[in-house]
């Protein structure tokens, strides 16, 4: 029941909130809007790893879940009291004026769904294989500072918070097309998995007691966090901008379903964690992530056309 309630609540909340963000801004401002939205999401997740791990170790699971309950209970009155602040712009203002047909725009979104599945399959390893690697194969101190496995979850959020303004400034100074940002994201995702494949080989053959430096995980998390900023908020923005108004909800739902499918694939791949060597496991993820790059490249002309080669 707990997981079912959690899944239902997240489905109702996250999908509608994401669509609401798109309705509040014109197409030209949505990339920046979703980047700020994504920044806020990670601001909320930053203390969870540290606080959850500390509460569990000192007071047990019941204390950690109680704090979650209190935090979520506060969201309801806040949302109710601030509901009048949201003023979606009129439908005719949000409608795209690209020359591309509705069919082209829908086909572009559908063509990006497999890329989303592959990316999030690798991305959500942070909650499964990477956490297990942190627990069983990584030293728990760095320069005398203790690092618990749950702390890496907060590290990822902290990296997103820190890198968002940096990447915004970089792309403002050196403009990059949407297509190229997606390609960069998938390339960094593949490189992140490759780093963990190398770390696994070090753990197996050269490191004492099979434990490696936390710097391996930190490097991998840094790469996947930058990749996340190039793919995830941009994906929401793309769907919001390209969706014909009458299909906007459906197509945003399909994008969310692709994310969920990637998460599901993470669980299925987790079966291989105990059956394969860790190096082979992360090698598989490296190959899967890299396979999305030619898939994106094959769609580059249509993607540029429907976006008007937006930069």
Region roles according to the model:
Residues 1-13, 205-230:
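Hydrophobic core of transmembrane alpha-helices in multi-pass small-molecule transporters
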Residues 145-174, 185-193:
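Transmembrane alpha-helices of Major Facilitator/SLC transporters
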Residues 27-37, 146, 214, 236, ...:
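Loop-to-transmembrane helix entry/capping segments in MFS-fold secondary transporters
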Residues 27-31, 47, 52-145, 167-175, ...:
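Intracellular loop-helix junctions on the cytosolic face of multi-pass helical membrane proteins
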Residues 1, 187-209:
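C-terminal ends and interior cores of transmembrane alpha-helices
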Residues 12-26, 229-243:
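Intracellular juxtamembrane helix-capping segments at the cytosolic ends
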Residues 31-57, 69-75, 153-157, 252-266:
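Glycine-rich segments within core transmembrane alpha-helices of 12-TM secondary carriers
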Residues 54-70, 177-180, 211-212, 271-290:
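A membrane-interface helix-boundary motif in multi-pass transporters
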């Amino acid at each position: 029941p707990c997981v079912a309630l959690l899944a239902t609540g997240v489905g109702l909340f996250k999908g509608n909130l994401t669509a609401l963000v798109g309705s509040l801004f014109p197409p030209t401002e949505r990339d920046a809007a979703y980047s700020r939205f994504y920044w806020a999401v990670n601001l909320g997740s930053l203390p969870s790893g540290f606080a959850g791990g500390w509460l569990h170790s000192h007071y047990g699971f019941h204390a950690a879940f109680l704090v979650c309950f209190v935090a979520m209970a506060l969201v309801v009155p806040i949302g109710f009291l601030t509901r009048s602040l949201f003023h979606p712009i009129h439908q005719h203002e949000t409608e795209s004026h690209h020359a591309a047909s509705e069919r082209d725009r829908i086909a572009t979104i559908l063509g990006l769904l497999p890329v989303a599945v592959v990316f999030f399959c690798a991305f959500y390893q942070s909650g499964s294989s990477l956490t297990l690697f942190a627990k069983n194969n990584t030293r728990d101190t760095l320069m005398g500072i203790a690092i618990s496995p749950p702390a890496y979850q907060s590290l990822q959020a902290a990296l997103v918070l820190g890198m968002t303004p940096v990447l915004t400034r970089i792309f403002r100074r050196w403009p990059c097309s949407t297509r190229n940002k997606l390609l960069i994201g998938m390339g960094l995702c593949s490189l992140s998995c490759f780093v963990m494949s190398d770390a696994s080989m070090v753990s197996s053959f050269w490191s004492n007691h099979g434990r490696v430096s936390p710097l391996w995980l930190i490097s991998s998390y840094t790469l996947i966090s930058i990749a996340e900023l190039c793919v995830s908020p941009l994906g929401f923005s793309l769907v919001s901008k390209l969706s014909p108004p009458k299909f906007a909800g459906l197509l945003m739902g399909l994008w969310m379903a692709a994310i969920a499918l990637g998460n599901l694939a993470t669980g299925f791949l987790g079966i291989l964690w105990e059956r394969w060597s860790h190096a082979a496991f992360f090698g598989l993820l490296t190959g899967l992530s890299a396979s999305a790059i030619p898939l994106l490249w094959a769609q580059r002309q249509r993607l540029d056309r429907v976006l008007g080669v937006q930069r």
